[in-house]
Structures are given as structure tokens and as C-alpha cells.
From Swiss-Prot:
Superkingdom assignment: Eukaryota
Chain segments annotated as coiled-coil in the UniProt record: 137-168
Taxonomic source organism: Homo sapiens (Human)
Name under which the protein is recorded: Centrosomal AT-AC splicing factor
GO biological process assignments: chromosome separation; mRNA splicing, via spliceosome; negative regulation of centrosome duplication; regulation of protein catabolic process
Segments of skewed composition (Polar residues): 190-204
Subunit structure: Interacts with SASS6; the interaction increases with CENATAC acetylation.
Effect of residue 31 to R: Strongly reduces acetylation. No effect on interaction with SASS6
Function per UniProt: Component of the minor spliceosome that promotes splicing of a specific, rare minor intron subtype. Negative regulator of centrosome duplication. Constrains centriole number by modulating the degradation of the centrosome-duplication-associated protein SASS6 in an acetylation-dependent manner. SIRT1 deacetylates CENATAC in G1 phase, allowing for SASS6 accumulation on the centrosome and subsequent procentriole assembly.
Modification after translation (UniProt): Acetylated. Acetylation oscillates throughout the cell cycle, and the acetylation state at Lys-31 is regulated by the deacetylase SIRT1 and the acetyltransferase NAT10. Deacetylated CENATAC is responsible for its centrosome targeting, and acetylated CENATAC promotes SASS6 degradation by enhancing the binding affinity of SASS6 for APC/C E3 ubiquitin-protein ligase complex/FZR1.
Location within or outside the cell: Cytoplasm, Cytoskeleton, Microtubule organizing center, Centrosome
Region (Required for centrosome location): 1-169
Pathological condition linked to this protein in its record: Mosaic variegated aneuploidy syndrome 4: A form of mosaic variegated aneuploidy syndrome, a severe disorder characterized by mosaic aneuploidies, predominantly trisomies and monosomies, involving multiple different chromosomes and tissues. Affected individuals typically present with severe intrauterine growth retardation and microcephaly. Eye anomalies, mild dysmorphism, variable developmental delay, and a broad spectrum of additional congenital abnormalities and medical conditions may also occur.
């Protein structure tokens, strides 16, 4: 028996030697694993001709699992606040260690030879990527400069509008002269000084006295109705019984029971028992309170107590005929 070997793709131990890599299950697992890695490799290959440079975000720290090397590889290449998309993955795919591990992986797992070139990056392609990365950095710097210029222009525009507002407020304005009735130009500074001096000096103007409020003015007086004391009803301050301690008249008149009586409870209990029985049973609608006569049962002859059966039968027929004849005569 061949020694036990562990397959990392199938995640199981086998004892068939090299024959396991040719099995259908192993080839299916190998194909699925390569297809999971292939979209990331294809996206990295597209970045060779046109490298993209973006501002760094925490999502750029994402890693992917290299199936050939058996290790994690960073997808993007970050430096400072800049990130080159798929720079880390392309650098790993172009390394000689990855090429050596890929050849070993393909030989051990007997993968398709046509797919091996998709997971390798030649030094020429990586050099082309470096050139496109330089162009991407230049274009990113141009975009950043353009954005900075636009922001600076917007800031200058806001600052200019603010200065215009301040200038329009501080401009000298014409203040009308109340003595001559004509308008004479005065400066804002002079007017401010005049207002300040007038505030400092005590005013000589005689202000009219404030009107004194007469609270005892004559007018329609209020009518005193008197103390509204209900006779016979006390107050808690006078030592009377609180309202919630006084018994109601209905309670005093008759001490009535709360809830149904015991007989009603038994009737209701019996009804609840009958509800559980099938509604289509025999005698479900029978009124037990109705009175029935003694002869309500159907008569099939006399009860056979003693003697012969035919004697009781003949006696019953004779009595029935006599009763029938008697009833017929009564009706006529």
C-alpha cells in the first residue's frame, strides 16, 4: 500500500499514490480553485496597459490567496496616501518565486498547460506596467492640481464677495440734516462719534411722566354670591368622611351578589361540556326540560313476564282492539 498523502485541494488523505491527481474529484476541485483566482488575475492584467492611481482608502489593504504559492498576496500597492490598483498582485505574478511555484503546482496537480500562462506575468509586461504607472501618477497629479485650482478659485470668489459686502457697509453715506431739510454728506466715522458723545452726555429732554395706574378705578363691581356650602355634606378639613369611604346607595339598599349564581354556573358548565360533543349526534337538539307522558315509548307488545309468548301476544292484541274500538266510539 502506498504511504498516506494529504491533498490540500480535496482536503482529504489518500493512499493511492500519484493516481489521486488523475481522479475526477481532484480535477474538479482544481478547476474550481483556479476559476476563483482567475477573475482577479485578469483584472490585474488589464491594469498593465493603463495603471490606475487613486487616493488611499482602507479597502485597498485587501489581500487574495495565491493558489500556486500557498500564501496571501496584497492586491494593491499603496504608498502614503496614494494607491496603485493591482500593483501588488502584478508584482507577485512577475516574481521568479511565483513562476517557480507555479511550475511545481502545475506538475504536481496535472493542471491544463494552456491555463498556466494566464497566471504568469513576464518581465516585459511588468516593465510596461511600470511605465503606465508613471503616466498614471502624472495624470493623477494633474487632476489633483486641477481640483486644487478650482477650490482656490472658489475660495477667492467667496473672499471677494465678502470683502465687497464689508466695503459696501463701510462706505460713506449721506445723512439728512433735520434743521435745514437738505442732505449733507457725513462720514460714517463722524456719525459714530456723534452717537457715542450723545450717549455719554446726560439727556436734557423732559420725557412725559409715565401714567400712574389707578387700581381703585370706578367701574362695574363684582357681585358677592356667598359661600357655596352644601348643607349636609362635610369636608375632609372639617373631619367628615372622605368620599371614597362612603358606601353607595345601591350597596346599602340591597347587598347584591357579584357575578352569576351557583345554579347559573352549573348550567353554564353543562353547556360547555355539551359544546365539546359532536353537533350531529342523536338527541343533540332534545329539550330536556319538556314533559313527556308515560306512553311515549313505542309499544311492540306486552312484556313477556310469565306464561307462553303467544298468550301474552294474543292478550295484547285483544286489549289493543278494545282500546281502538273505544277510541272510535268516542270520536263518533
Amino acid at each position: 500500500m502506498a504511504p498516506a498523502q494529504r491533498c490540500p485541494l480535496c482536503r482529504q488523505t489518500f493512499f493511492c499514490g500519484r493516481g489521486h491527481v488523475y481522479s475526477r474529484k481532484h480535477q474538479r476541485q482544481l478547476k474550481e480553485a483556479l476559476e476563483r483566482l482567475l477573475p482577479q488575475v485578469e483584472a490585474a492584467r488589464k491594469a498593465i496597459r493603463a495603471a490606475q492611481v487613486e487616493r488611499y482608502v482602507p479597502e485597498h489593504e485587501r489581500c487574495c490567496w495565491c493558489l500556486c504559492c500557498g500564501c496571501e498576496v496584497r492586491e494593491h500597492l499603496s504608498h502614503g496616501n496614494l494607491t496603485v490598483l493591482y500593483g501588488g498582485l502584478l508584482e507577485h505574478l512577475a516574481s521568479p518565486e511565483h513562476k517557480k511555484a507555479t511550475n511545481k503546482f502545475w506538475w504536481e496537480n496535472k493542471a491544463e498547460v494552456q491555463m498556466k500562462e494566464k497566471f504568469l506575468v513576464t518581465p516585459q509586461d511588468y516593465a510596461r506596467f511600470k511605465k503606465s504607472m508613471v503616466k498614471g501618477l502624472d495624470s493623477y497629479e494633474e487632476k489633483e492640481d486641477k481640483v486644487i485650482k478650482e477650490m482656490a478659485a472658489q475660495i477667492r470668489e467667496v473672499e471677494q464677495s465678502r470683502q465687497e459686502v464689508v466695503r459696501s457697509v463701510l462706505e460713506p453715506q449721506a445723512v439728512p440734516d433735520p434743521e435745514e431739510g437738505s442732505s449733507a454728506p457725513r462720514s460714517w466715522k463722524g456719525m459714530n462719534s456723534q452717537v457715542a458723545s450723545s450717549l455719554q452726555q446726560p439727556s436734557n429732554l423732559d420725557l412725559p411722566p409715565a401714567p400712574e395706574l389707578d387700581w381703585m378705578e370706578t367701574g362695574p363691581s363684582l357681585t358677592f354670591i356667598g359661600h357655596q356650602d352644601i348643607p349636609g355634606v362635610g369636608n375632609i378639613h372639617s373631619g367628615a368622611t372622605p368620599p371614597w369611604m362612603i358606601q353607595d346607595e345601591e350597596y346599602i339598599a340591597g347587598n347584591q351578589e357579584i357575578g352569576p349564581s351557583y345554579e347559573e354556573f352549573l348550567k353554564e358548565k353543562e353547556k360547555q361540556k355539551l359544546k365539546k360533543l359532536p353537533p350531529d349526534r342523536v338527541g343533540a337538539n332534545f329539550d330536556h326540560s319538556s314533559r313527556t307522558s308515560a306512553g311515549w315509548l313505542p309499544s311492540f307488545g306486552r312484556v313477556w313476564n310469565n306464561g307462553r309468548r303467544w298468550q301474552s301476544r294474543h292478550q295484547f292484541k285483544t286489549e289493543a282492539a278494545a282500546m281502538k274500538k273505544q277510541s272510535h266510539t268516542e270520536k263518533s
